[in-house]
Amino acid sequence: MTKLIVRTALLTLLTCLTSIISKAQIGYDYARYDVGFSLGFNQFYGDVVTAKSTKGVNFNFNYNQSPFINYIFEAQFGKLAGGDAINDPLGRQFAADYQYYALRLQLQAGELIDYSGNGLANALKNLYIGSGVGIIYSKISSINRYSVQFPGYYTPGLDKTSQIFVPVRIGYEFKIFNKYQRPDIKIDVGYQYNAVFGDELDGFNSGHLNDAYSQFVIGVKFSIGEVTSYRKQINF
């Protein structure tokens, strides 16, 4: 009888402790991994005069060292375009399909600041900067190399290229918390500048500056897999 009472008491105590510990973790937990996708609105900078807006779609996998330090592998597919064969003096105009693969580190302000008890700091904690490295493949789908205004003028270049690039990004991640105060859905809004180590992303090899393109990006991420705890409360 005594053993039964002791066993029941220990079991009750263990249950209470487990409940207390569990409740203590509410607001501290986050998932180690995210998967997501985004839509980007592109603008190209290179050897053409007239800018044109195009789109790209991004798929990403994230490893979260913390809620505010993220290692991101991403694949992006889209189109780039620019120029005007008739009105631009050198007649350059192109359209290209591209795909890129990149690794990027993202650091959010919440990793560096104390946002507890401060409304402004709490709002700024999801602001982030990031950079990395990747490779971009482009294939020209249409191009004009001859000038209408200067007959005989021709701009050389390649129709297919693969080049290293560096993405630099700034943005804000809106975290949506579940009933356990865990950030399970994230809305990502950002601006990304992709600096290419080469001059033929547009199919033209004529300038002394490398090509680049910028993006306004909006996307969503979903948490998956293992859940762990952060050193401080995530949501206030």
Predicted regions and their residues:
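Residues on the lipid-exposed face of transmembrane beta-strands in outer-membrane beta-barrel proteins
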Residues: F37-F41, F59-Y63, L103-L107, S131-I135, ...
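Structural signature of outer-membrane beta-barrel domains
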Residues: N42-F44, G78-G82, G110, G134-I140, ...
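Extracellular loop and loop/strand-boundary signature of outer-membrane beta-barrel proteins
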Residues: F44-D47, D84-Y98, G117, G152-L158, ...
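Predominantly the C-terminal beta-signal and adjacent terminal strand-loop region
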Residues: Y98, F174-F236
